[in-house]
Amino acid sequence: MRCLHCGKEISSHADLTEQKNRWHRRCIKKFFGTKELPMADITEEQLEQLANDTVNQGLTVPGVQRKMSIHLSTDLNTKLTIVDYPAGYILKPQTKEYENLPEYEDLAMRMAEIAGIQTVPHALMRMNDQYVYITRRIDRDIHGKQITMYAMEDFCQLAGRLTADKYRGSYELCARIIKKYSVLPGFDLSELFLRVVFSFLTGNSDMHLKNFSLKEQEAGKRNFCLSKAYDILPVNVIIPEDNEQLALTLNGKKRNIRKKDFIIFAEKCGIPVKSAEKIMRKVCLLKERFIIACDESYLPEMNKEEMKQLIICREEILH
């Protein structure tokens, strides 16, 4: 049995609470800042209403997942609720349209961490006998009643685009945004390159302009750097009929991507070819670890195999 937060084994000698929750006590403290795993004070009716709102707005993957901002209340019992402020967490439940989205996102985030990509704090929880995905917001620090806010702007905003145009752009545009606004452009450009390579390898065709952001490093200082990665999904596996391999254009295209396209992109970013090849080689060498992560994930066996086959095929293109 593995912890739903850190992914490490829960000892057979662990207390019954850890085994029941499938969370280490230390992981509960790290993620929620509490001694006990919060109970989810969210009803089936609220989840159903969220589903209806999502469908009515036409918000499905690719696009916007069902999600709700939630508050951690410690007044009487430790619980997660949607009625109070401040909302320090985001919860993503299961959907009828696409099965196992929480499990897919959890796997994708864990593989990103294996690749050396910094990710937002995230985990799985059990709710109504199903997995839900939960992430902690990084644009605020909440300590009791004290809240510190950090400015965070996504690339759609920084490019002056409407949300509806989040797929109309290129990764070269993302590089220009970083060069213009980041206080660490060299580091962030290399990180951008790594994330685009990783997105291709794992079938994430949904890394659009709103899924990249710059965030203040110190509240109120306006010292922006590329934020930690979030909203990572292997859409090419979830929706096999999606023919596009990337959300934005790379070297002028979204499909039939080849290794040379990444090299040309690196040159446009000002990344030396040798450095770009080293990054791609590093990601390819992690193939076996990605496959192990798939095997250890909470996806059904068929979905695990589909995920592994995609990684193997994409690695051959990058190799």
What name fits each language-model region?
Residues 1-48, 52-54, 220, 224, ...:
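Regulatory N- and C-terminal appendages and interdomain linkers associated
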Residues 46-166, 274:
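Conserved ATP-binding subdomain of kinase catalytic cores across diverse folds
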Residues 70, 112, 155, 206, ...:
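A residue-level signal for conserved active-site and pocket-lining positions in enzyme catalytic cores
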Residues 97-113, 170-237:
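Conserved kinase catalytic-core segment
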Residues 127-130, 211-217, 283:
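A glycine-rich phosphate-binding loop feature that marks nucleotide/adenosyl-phosphate handling sites
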Residues 128-201, 248, 264, 268:
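ATP-dependent phospho-/nucleotidyl transfer catalytic cores
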Residues 154-177, 214-274:
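Catalytic-core segments of enzymes that bind and process phosphorylated/nucleotide-bearing substrates
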Residues 251-312, 318:
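Mobile late-domain/C-terminal helix-loop "cap" segments
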